[in-house]
A protein has these predicted regions:
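Metalloprotease/metallohydrolase-associated module, dominated by Zn2+-dependent proteases
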Residues: 2-55, 60
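Stable alpha-helical elements in mature extracytoplasmic
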Residues: 20, 28, 124, 129-132, ...
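Short amphipathic alpha-helical segments that mediate assembly, nucleic-acid/protein binding
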Residues: 39, 51-62, 154, 164, ...
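Surface-exposed polar/charged interaction patches
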Residues: 42-52, 68-71, 174, 208
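Acidic, amphipathic alpha-helical interaction segments
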Residues: 58, 68-89, 268-278, 284-289
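Active-site nucleophile-adjacent alpha helix/oxyanion-hole segment immediately C-terminal to the catalytic cysteine
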Residues: 64-171
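Conserved active-site-adjacent core of cysteine acyl-enzyme catalytic domains
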Residues: 138-223, 227-241, 247-254
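Active-site signature of cysteine proteases
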Residues: 223-225, 229-291
Length: 291
């Protein structure tokens, strides 16, 4: 009751029927007015690729996120501020560039083992299921980072099957659903995935400007959760929040083509894509972040 108004239009956080408004004393009204102003400010700073309804729901949810996290949301971050491993700062590479190294990647770059890498660092190399949402929330202005994945933790739970998608809700509070690769294959009558078909899937599923979480199974085994982002100039970019693949980094060569060439031919149902910049984070999983 009392939440049926539209704050983006009437500039009221609560309707006149809500007890806060109907029976508010002077101090309570001042608090409501302050929250209403914050809602309006957050809506104003959101990108144009969100609908007004999405902006309103996200703005209200941001207040809940602030309360649950115990921090105040800042201004939206740029891609550079949210990315470049800023979502996972404790990640440490097990192998480091070395012209004389004994190990070599697909690009011919040579590496040697990182002497500073310790067994305890491994948890920050298997925490992709929190790095992806951490990046999305950093874009909104939440200065949070990913925790490491340890046995029995909620990160461990999210690493299993379709569980990773449970962190996202639609703006009406219902569970958000991913577009599964297997479902897409069935609609195309494809029996298996190929690099060309992965590209087709990415382009079709990520056609609108926005931030998308991708769950992909590797040809070599195992899987990964990461980010595809469609920019307003039409570019579709692979952004890796777990370990930096931005321009100038040692992993710069890991791009959308790399994903297409590395994906499994016969993926599990849990693999797929979900647009997440227009979703609400499920605060039941808030403990997967450091702040």
């Amino acid at each position: 009751p009392g939440l049926e108004n539209n704050p983006g239009k009437d500039e009221k956080l609560f309707s006149d029927k809500h007890p806060y408004q109907k029976d508010a004393h002077r101090g309570a009204k001042k608090t409501v007015d302050k929250l209403t102003l914050r809602i309006k400010e957050m809506i104003a700073e959101m990108p144009d690729n969100l609908t007004l309804e999405e902006k309103e729901a996200i703005a209200r949810h941001n207040l809940q996120m602030e309360k649950t996290l115990g921090i105040t949301k800042g201004k939206p971050m740029t891609v550079e501020e949210a990315d470049k491993q800023n979502a996972n700062p404790k990640h440490k590479e097990q192998f480091i560039p070395d012209p004389q190294g004994l190990y070599q990647d697909k690009q011919g770059n040579k590496f040697s083992k990182n002497p500073d890498f310790k067994p305890a660092d491994r948890q920050y190399g298997i925490n992709c299921q929190t790095c992806a949402p951490a990046y999305a929330l950093r874009l909104k202005g939440f200065d949070i980072t990913a925790k490491g994945n340890t046995p029995g933790s909620k990160l461990d739970y999210l690493s299993r099957g379709t569980n990773a998608w449970e962190v996202w809700k639609n703006i009406d509070g219902t569970q958000a659903k991913h577009t599964s690769i297997t479902g897409w294959m069935a609609s195309k009558q494809y029996m298996k995935m190929t690099p060309k078909r992965y590209r087709e899937f990415f382009e079709e599923t990520c056609k609108d400007e926005g931030v998308y979480e991708l769950s992909i199974g590797w040809k070599s085994g195992g899987g990964h959760a990461t980010i595809l982002q469609r920019f307003n100039d039409g570019e579709l970019r692979y952004i890796e929040p777990q370990h930096d693949n931005s321009k100038g980094s040692v992993n710069e060569w890991k791009d959308v083509r790399y994903l297409c060439e590395s994906g499994q031919a016969n993926p599990h149902y849990c693999r797929g894509i979900m647009r997440i910049d227009n979703k609400l984070f499920n605060t039941d999983f808030i403990e997967i972040f450091d702040k």
